[in-house]
Amino acid sequence: MPRFEVGMGALWVGGQPLGTKAATETTGPGGSAPLFSTSSDLAGAAGIDGRVGVRLTRALVAEAEASYLTPQLRVAISGDFEGAAAVTATETVQQFTIGGGVLWYLPNGGRARRFAPFAVAGGGYLRQLHDQGTLVDTGRYYQVGGGATYLLASGRHFHTNGIGARVDVRAFFRSKGVAFDGGGHTSPAAGLTAFVRF
C-alpha cells in the first residue's frame, strides 16, 4: 500500500462579499447626514496549490497543504451627497494559505479500483498582502468538501507506486484577513491536482 502522496495543481476560490458601509457627517443637533456609501468584495481568482499526504490507514490520509492566488479587492463608492458619479477602486491582493487536513476515502464496494471518492476537511493560516505588499492582513481558513481521485497508472514505475488526478469541491470559510465588517466569509472552491504516490 503506497504510504506517501505528493500533488500539485490548479485552484479556484470564488468571490466573497466583504460588506457595505455608509460614511456620515455629524450634524449640529447630534444627528448625522450621509456622505456616501461603499460596498466591498474580494473577487474570485485562480491560483496554484500543493499538498503532501501521509496514509494513516487504508481509508484515512493526513495532509499538509499550501496555496497561492491573487484575487482583486474591489471597493465600489456610490451615493455621494454632492452627486458625483459612482466609482469602483480595485487592487490586487496576494493570498497565501498553509495548513492541514484529513481525507477519508469513502467505501465504494470495490466496484472501481482506479476511482475513489472521498470527503475532506481542514484549515490553517491565511496571509494576505495588499497596497503593493506594504499592508499585511492575517487570519484563519477552514474548508470542508469532497471529490474523487482517479489512478492513471498503478504499480511501480520509476520509483513511484502510482500516478493519478484528483478533483474536489469545497466550501472555503475565511475568518479575518482582508475584511471591512469584521466577520467570516464563505465561498465555493474547486481544485484539479496531479499526484504521485510513493
Regions from the PLM with identified roles:
Residues 3, 43-48, 95-99, 139-143, ...:
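Transmembrane beta-barrel architecture of outer-membrane proteins
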Residues 42-44, 92-94, 113-115, 136-138, ...:
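A generic structural micro-feature
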Residues 6-8, 117-123, 164-170:
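Extended hydrophobic secondary-structure segments that form protein cores and membrane-embedded regions
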Residues 30-37, 82-87, 128-130, 175-177:
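Extracytoplasmic loops and strand-loop junctions of Gram-negative outer membrane beta-barrel proteins
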Residues 22-29, 78-85, 135-139, 181-187:
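Flexible, surface-exposed loop regions and adjacent strand-edge segments
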Residues 19-21, 71-73, 149-198:
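Predominantly the C-terminal beta-signal and adjacent terminal strand-loop region
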Residues 10-14, 51-141, 150-155:
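Gram-negative (and chloroplast) outer-membrane scaffold detector with strong preference
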